[in-house]
Swiss-Prot record:
It holds the Pfam family Aminotran_3. Pathway: Porphyrin-containing compound metabolism; protoporphyrin-IX biosynthesis; 5-aminolevulinate from L-glutamyl-tRNA(Glu): step 2/2. Its main location: cytoplasm. One of its GO terms (biological process) is protoporphyrinogen IX biosynthetic process. GO terms for molecular function: glutamate-1-semialdehyde 2,1-aminomutase activity; pyridoxal phosphate binding; transaminase activity. Gene3D superfamilies: Aspartate Aminotransferase, domain 1 (3.90.1150.10), Type I PLP-dependent aspartate aminotransferase-like (Major domain) (3.40.640.10). The modification N6-(pyridoxal phosphate)lysine is found at K268. This is Glutamate-1-semialdehyde 2,1-aminomutase 2. One of its GO terms (cellular component) is cytoplasm. Its EC number is 5.4.3.8. The keyword Zinc does not apply. NCBIfam families: hemL, PRK00062.1.
């Protein structure tokens, strides 16, 4: 059994100065019934806590670190950029360079605006959709999390699901009434919504692979159906690729599935571990944003040189071969853990998309929020604690996915499988 005494003391101190002792709710580890583990440093696929424990990290700062921790080239470029200045409040060529790289790789994006977070990206995209169409209603999907903007905290996933909340107090009814929620992967319900509200719907926002109720890929025809419905009714299709962008595929989820939205929201990977977000799409829509158009959006640190530098270096290192390797390693991890669970009589369902992996303690299939919630959360908490003691750091929530990086080795994968075997054996014996 590992010692977490320093983390325990650090958490007690943190609770005196921060709400719940953390700056994002899922970091409180409430759903796994333990105190949060405080981290000190990371290198490659490994992360180290303040008690000196080492872990193979499958959280990767909730997705951004696709090259692993402290990638030497990324760190070097950030250091060089910082020496020139951390922020100017004026344009830099770095912004243009990253924008050109994003436009080159993301099928839907002709023009892109940089912001400082994924939440900013989705909020700004919704304002743009409303301003462009002259309509007010937005459709989202149950269990999909698009940041903490008021109009999107309706039946959200991620940390909201982890805390067992349907939505958040503080969201005015006047805002909530313009958000329509539909079960994920349910195209028939979408057709009914458009039959009733089609002329009032500004846009449909969707995670092309849901990543905030665990990992839940789209069923066949779902994304294609959304594209057809929105085009028919003059609404915008918005892909929230903050998580899936450059994780599912070299050309993002839209490239992988062959469905092109009107607007795309990005974040995480494109900042290489620094705060960033972006939204982009067709030129005729994006040109409505100030200063070229009347729809306002601004940000003090948008496009700051450190985030642009980290994002540029990260994307430059990713190649189509990177994604083939992700798939190979994810296949092995899924097969090994599935076999270990089956051997010990533990129900386990895997979902996967590129370097995103989700597994649920249920017999499945898991295709939406309702089926995701059927997972045995008590069993997940047992598994989580056991894997932490075995030196494997997982997301402390059933409703979050695992991430792979280019730094994960075959030895890391085998160590993780062996750890899962031991943990499942202990759980099986105790039941």
């Amino acid at each position: 059994m590992r010692s977490y005494e320093k983390s325990k003391a650090a958490f007690e101190e943190a609770q005196r100065v921060m709400p719940g002792g953390v700056n994002s709710p899922v970091r409180a580890f409430k759903s796994v019934n333990m105190d949060p583990i405080f981290m000190e440093r990371g290198k490659g696929s490994k992360i180290y806590d303040i008690d000196g424990n080492e872990y193979i990290d499958y959280v990767l700062s909730w997705g951004p670190l696709i090259l692993g921790h402290s990638n030497e080239k990324v760190v070097k470029e950030i250091q060089k950029a910082a020496e020139h200045g951390t922020s100017f409040g004026a344009p830099t060529e770095l912004e243009t360079e990253l924008a050109e790289l994003v436009i080159d790789r993301v099928p839907s994006i002709e023009i892109v605006r940089m912001v400082s977070s994924g939440t900013e990206a989705t909020m700004s995209a919704l304002r743009l959709a409303r301003g462009y169409t002259g309509r007010n209603k937005i459709v989202k999907f149950e269990g999909c999390y698009h940041g903490h903007g008021d109009s999107l905290l309706i039946k959200a996933g991620s940390g909201v699901a982890t805390l067992g909340l349907p939505d958040s107090p503080g969201v005015p009814e006047s805002i909530a009434k313009n958000t329509i929620t539909v079960p994920y992967n349910d195209l028939e319900s979408m057709k009914l919504v458009f039959q009733e509200f089609g002329d009032d719907i500004a846009g449909v926002i969707v995670e092309p692979v849901a990543g905030n109720m665990g990992v839940v890929p789209p069923v066949k025809g779902f994304l294609e159906g959304l594209r057809e419905l929105t085009e028919t009714h003059g609404a915008l299709l918005i892909f929230d690729e903050v998580m899936t962008g450059f994780r599912v595929d070299y050309n993002c989820a839209q490239g992988y599935f062959g469905v092109t939205p009107d607007l795309t929201c990005l974040g995480k990977v494109i900042g290489g571990g620094l705060p960033v977000g972006a939204y982009g799409g067709k030129a005729e829509i994006m040109e409505k944003i100030a200063p070229s158009g009347p729809i306002y959006q601004a940000g003090t640190l948008s496009g700051n040189p450190l985030a642009m530098t980290a994002g540029l270096e990260t994307l430059k290192q990713l190649t189509p071969e990177s994604y083939r390797e992700f798939s190979r390693k994810a296949d092995r991890l899924e097969k090994g853990i599935s076999e270990a669970a089956e051997k010990n009589g533990i129900p386990c369902t895997f979902n996967r998309a590129g370097s995103m992996i989700g597994f649920f303690f249920t017999n499945g299939p898991v295709i939406n929020y309702d089926t995701a919630k059927q997972s045995d959360l008590g069993l997940f908490a047992e598994y989580y604690k056991g894997m932490a003691d075995e030196g494997v750091f997982l997301p402390p929530s059933q409703f979050e996915g695992l991430f792979l990086s280019t730094a994960h080795t075959d030895d890391d994968i085998e160590h993780t499988i062996k750890a899962a075997e031991r943990v499942f054996e202990r759980i099986s014996r105790s039941r």
